[in-house]
């Protein structure tokens, strides 16, 4: 198909080339010449004059076409006839020329046509091949572009699908979260209502508990008074029992003495008159010397007074006769007390208690006393400090402590600051620090400037007793952050 098209196109080019190289001229003799140029070859034809042309009968025939003046209708018809005759003559002449050319130039034209056709065919084939190659290349490029566009379109469709899926998921999550928020709001409203109801019930319960607490406090007060009475009766019974034992012992000695005297004929019949037995005691040493050697609670009398106070007497440690002025063992008693309470004493002699600064001051102001401090830690170790001279000044001197002559195993340096320090409580600050040691360290003590000891500090149980600045401490034995398990402070006369 392409070859036929190229062949036809080549033949048209040959004819066009032939007619384009066709020239007409007149020689010197007046004869007409026709020259044909085909490539490097040139062909000249001499043609005879045509004698069959019609003669013009009108004066306007020769130049009828070139006239510019207006003519009437008859002149126009004549002119058209003349033109038709001329056109017919020219047509005949051309036909003759064509026949002549065909006869004379047939062979050459055939060869020329063949050469031209071959050349043009080769060129056309080459052009066609090039066009085919270019078309194929363009087709491949178009195919590649289509593939790329298809891939890009597919990728975009996948991304769009993924975005659509993600959007659907997000919308679902938003719906779920909105639903959860609504549920939480409903639950929150329910809980708020429940909290309000619980607050109301709690207020009622608190009011009821307050009333019960008041009733329990009244009951505890009554029971405390009953317990105090029972303790008094127990102490009285103990003292009476001890006195009965002593009287029985004295009676047995008297009976034995009488029996001895009666069995001896040379003995004088006289009976010794015994002194009146002492029934009041200044301290536990006097009780011990009276023959009462059992540790327990006894009644002591203030010096130069009939006022009495209960104290625990230790008749076992170091020969006995010790009056216990302080004891800590389980944290059952709060030692963060006022000045008045430390002055008069508090707690129970059977457990944790403070005997009272006023009694100790009056007692140690009349005779020379020694002070022994016993300490226990949470690991089962024990230590003590013994001062061979101890006394407290009066209230006007803030019960200032005086100590000398330290011995013992609880440190070679006294953990109670010397010279004497004033006593301080939470409501009476007499220390040498602007920080109020009693409020910061807890309890009443001879703090000096929040010094190295405080046996009346906060009680801490085991495993909670380390790194406690406000605990029961004795610096020169266990350090400042160790809170002890038990402490006892006791005194007796130096000449016991």
Curated annotation (Swiss-Prot):
Entry keywords, A to Z: Angiogenesis, Calcium, Coiled coil, Developmental protein, Differentiation, Disulfide bond, Glycoprotein, Metal-binding, Secreted, Signal
Keyword Signal applies: yes
MF annotations from Gene Ontology: metal ion binding; receptor antagonist activity; receptor ligand activity; receptor tyrosine kinase binding; vascular endothelial growth factor receptor binding
Q: Which residues are glycosylated?
A: 89, 119, 133, 151, 240, 304
| Annotated tissue distribution | Expressed in the ovary, uterus and placenta.
Q: Which residues bind Ca(2+)?
A: 429, 431, 433, 435
Cystine residue pairs? 284-313, 433-435, 437-450
**Superkingdom per UniProt:** Eukaryota
Q: Extract the Gene3D superfamilies matched here.
A: Gamma Fibrinogen, chain A, domain 1, Gamma-fibrinogen Carboxyl Terminal Fragment, domain 2
What do we know about how this protein assembles, alone or with others?
Answer: Interacts with TEK/TIE2, competing for the same binding site as ANGPT1. Interacts with ITGA5. Interacts with SVEP1/polydom. Interacts with THBD; this interaction significantly inhibits the generation of activated PC and TAFIa/CPB2 by the thrombin/thrombomodulin complex.
Q: What is known of its domains?
A: The Fibrinogen C-terminal domain mediates interaction with the TEK/TIE2 receptor.
Q: What does this protein do?
A: Binds to TEK/TIE2, competing for the ANGPT1 binding site, and modulating ANGPT1 signaling. Can induce tyrosine phosphorylation of TEK/TIE2 in the absence of ANGPT1. In the absence of angiogenic inducers, such as VEGF, ANGPT2-mediated loosening of cell-matrix contacts may induce endothelial cell apoptosis with consequent vascular regression. In concert with VEGF, it may facilitate endothelial cell migration and proliferation, thus serving as a permissive angiogenic signal. Involved in the regulation of lymphangiogenesis.
Protein name as catalogued: Angiopoietin-2
């Amino acid at each position: 198909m392409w070859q036929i098209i190229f062949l036809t196109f080549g033949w048209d080019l040959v004819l066009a080339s032939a007619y384009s190289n066709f020239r007409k001229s007149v020689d010197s003799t007046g004869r007409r010449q026709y020259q044909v140029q085909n490539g490097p070859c040139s062909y000249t034809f001499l043609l005879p004059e045509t004698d069959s042309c019609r003669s013009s009968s009108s004066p306007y025939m020769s130049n009828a076409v070139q006239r510019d003046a207006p003519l009437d209708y008859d002149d126009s018809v004549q002119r058209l006839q003349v033109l038709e005759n001329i056109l017919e003559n020219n047509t005949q002449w051309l036909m003759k020329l064509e026949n002549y050319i065909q006869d004379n130039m047939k062979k050459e034209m055939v060869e020329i046509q063949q050469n031209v056709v071959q050349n043009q065919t080769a060129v056309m084939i080459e052009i066609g091949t090039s066009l085919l190659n270019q078309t194929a290349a363009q087709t491949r490029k178009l195919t590649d572009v289509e593939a790329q566009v298809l891939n890009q379109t597919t990728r975009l469709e996948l991304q769009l699908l993924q975005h659509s899926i993600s959007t659907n998921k997000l919308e679902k999550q938003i719906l779920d979260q909105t639903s959860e928020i609504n549920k939480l709001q409903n639950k929150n409203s329910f809980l708020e209502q429940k909290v309000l109801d619980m607050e109301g019930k709690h207020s009622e319960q608190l009011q009821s508990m307050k009333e019960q607490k008041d009733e329990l406090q009244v009951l505890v007060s009554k029971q405390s008074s009953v317990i105090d009475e029972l303790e008094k009766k127990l102490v009285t019974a103990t003292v009476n029992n001890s006195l009965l034992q002593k009287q029985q012992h004295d009676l047995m000695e008297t009976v034995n003495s009488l029996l001895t005297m009666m069995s001896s004929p040379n003995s004088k019949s006289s009976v010794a008159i015994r002194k009146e037995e002492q029934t009041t005691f200044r301290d536990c040493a006097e009780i011990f010397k009276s023959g009462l050697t059992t540790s327990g609670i006894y009644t002591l009398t203030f010096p130069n007074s009939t006022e009495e106070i209960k104290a625990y007497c230790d008749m076992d440690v170091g020969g006995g006769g010790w009056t216990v002025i302080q004891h800590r063992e389980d944290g059952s008693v709060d030692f963060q007390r006022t000045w008045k309470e430390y002055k008069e004493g508090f707690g129970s002699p059977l457990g944790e208690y403070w005997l009272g600064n006023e009694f100790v001051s009056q007692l140690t102001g009349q005779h020379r006393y020694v002070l022994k401090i016993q300490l226990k830690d949470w690991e089962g170790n024990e230590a003590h400090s013994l001062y061979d001279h101890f006394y407290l000044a009066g209230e006007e001197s803030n019960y200032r402590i005086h100590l000398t002559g330290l011995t013992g195993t609880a440190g070679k340096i006294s953990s109670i600051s010397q010279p004497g320090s004033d006593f301080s409580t939470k409501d009476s600050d007499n220390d040498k620090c602007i920080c109020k040691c009693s409020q910061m360290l807890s309890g009443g003590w001879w703090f000096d400037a929040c010094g190295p000891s405080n046996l009346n500090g906060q009680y801490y149980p085991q495993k909670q007793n380390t790194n406690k600045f406000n605990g029961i401490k004795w610096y020169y034995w266990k350090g400042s952050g160790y809170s002890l398990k038990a402490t006892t402070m006791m005194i007796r006369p130096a000449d016991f």
